[in-house]
Amino acid sequence: MTDAVKVGFVPLSTAPKGVLVVFTDESMKFGPASRKHLVNAGDVVKRAAAAAEFKGKSGSALDILAPQGVKAARLIVVGTGKAGSVKDEDFIKLGGTATGKIGSNASAVTLVAELPGGAMKPHQAAALAVGARLRGYKFDRYKTKTKDKDKALVAQFSVAVADVAAARKAFIRDAHVANGVVLARELVNEPPNVLYPAEFARRAAQLRKLGVKVEIFDVKAMEKLGMGALLGVSQGSYHPGRMVVMRWNGASNKADKPVAFVGKGVCFDTGGISIKPAGSMEEMKGDMAGAACVVGLMHALAARKAKVNAVGAIGIVENMPDGNAQRPGDIVKTMSGQTIEIINTDAEGRLVLADVLWYVTQKHKPKFIVDLATLTGAILVALGTEYAGLFSNNDQLSERLSKSGDATGERVWRMPLGPEFDKQIDSKFADMKNAAGRWGGSITAAQLLQRFVDNTPWAHLDIAGTAMGAPATDINTSWGSGYGVRLLDHLVAQHYETKR
């Protein structure tokens, strides 16, 4: 991993070093501090903008050698769109856009946190810095030779702000969340020969350093709990499965019910006996992205000392076609006592989640549960790579998730549930089957999960299209996106933290 965007905050008047980044809108005007940094170079910038057809549109940028008199080597002008149109959620994107233009040969960068109408507010400047940090991440641990154009950016970012102390305070909080995103990306990007279940559990256990209580369940412990669904998936692998339960008790009332998050952690998914086609099978190393998000989220909550009690639980397995592997036609008994007929061994994620959801529901009695899983290819057909599928038995929780998705850019789209779909997973031989017909595959998968949450408010996020291999964004060029960490941190911060 290269994650070397170092961020500091300086006064707006500080002389720039290295690369100077300023912001304008479609008026092509600059704020007062930016004008001072540009000295008398305004006309040169306008001519360069005209030649490059740069008009200040959102997401665009002009990159030129710094004109004479400007105390920097390069000048990058980032467009923000129509005057007055920038919203709070846009600042993180602006930081990412700027960083994407800088390249790998800069050692010092000054971002002037100012719009044409005046200085950015502290939380906006902090978001700008977070965007730079997230865009600067690159997973290159296993490269022994790297071309200059592919090298990661290693630079000191000085964010010039009106109120240094306030911006620094806001950034410290947001940086902990960004670190959680980076952790989730790291886990998803790791190759499966490195990140097998025991190693994943070991890395999750490192959250103990932040005050998180971590309990690791091995095969014997899960057998004792009766987790036949999870263990059935795991039984074909050389690497035995694990369940990891992480607890953060940050609420003023330690007895307050926790919020809970559950993640699917299939470290590699061949499909098992119902084996997948060879094409793109290597991407199934990312079938643990839901679990990665939960670990990243628990890191974020603990690091920023969130005033909430939270439980994060992940089921970690490999789905392999060994001689001892689960077969189509098998019937497994879950921790809940309900039985599941195996129709397709490649519908394994719901089996893992079934036992972990039931464990969390019964053991921790949470206020709500949100589970995340790269569960179905069908959700990609339905929603593409821009939205995660949201399924829920609770309108309030669903609405809150939708608003947090809009605020963070990690968007969700609610999908239906209902008895018409639920009956499709009924089995002739067991209480249910793990795969229904061809149509509505994401919905019938969610219907199975709903049978394991009792009456707990619950939401299921199918993140198959958003967590891995999604198109690059302003703040991410990594294969593993870390989707969900910022979304769920926002949900907790807005609605569930203790107010002091």
UniProtKB/Swiss-Prot annotation:
GO terms for cellular component: cytoplasm. It is an enzyme of class 3 (hydrolase). It is found in: Cytoplasm. It holds the Pfam family Peptidase_M17. Mn(2+) 2 binds at K264, D269, D287, E348. The lineage of its organism: Bacteria, Pseudomonadati, Pseudomonadota, Alphaproteobacteria, Hyphomicrobiales. This is Probable cytosol aminopeptidase. It comes from Afipia carboxidovorans (strain ATCC 49405 / DSM 1227 / KCTC 32145 / OM5). InterPro entries: Leucine_aapep/pepB, Macro_dom-like, Peptidase_M17_C, Peptidase_M17_leu_NH2_pept, Peptidase_M17_N. It catalyses: Release of an N-terminal amino acid, Xaa-|-Yaa-, in which Xaa is preferably Leu, but may be other amino acids including Pro although not Arg or Lys, and Yaa may be Pro. Amino acid amides and methyl esters are also readily hydrolyzed, but rates on arylamides are exceedingly low; Release of an N-terminal amino acid, preferentially leucine, but not glutamic or aspartic acids. Transmembrane segments: none annotated. It comes from the Bacteria. Belongs to the peptidase M17 family. Presumably involved in the processing and regular turnover of intracellular proteins. Catalyzes the removal of unsubstituted N-terminal amino acids from various peptides. Its cofactor is Mn(2+). Mn(2+) 1 binds at D269, D346, E348. SUPFAM superfamilies: Macro domain-like (SSF52949), Zn-dependent exopeptidases (SSF53187). Keywords: Aminopeptidase, Cytoplasm, Hydrolase, Manganese, Metal-binding, Protease. Binds 2 manganese ions per subunit. GO terms for molecular function: manganese ion binding; metalloaminopeptidase activity. GO terms for biological process: proteolysis. The active site is at K276, R350. Its EC number is 3.4.11.1, 3.4.11.10.
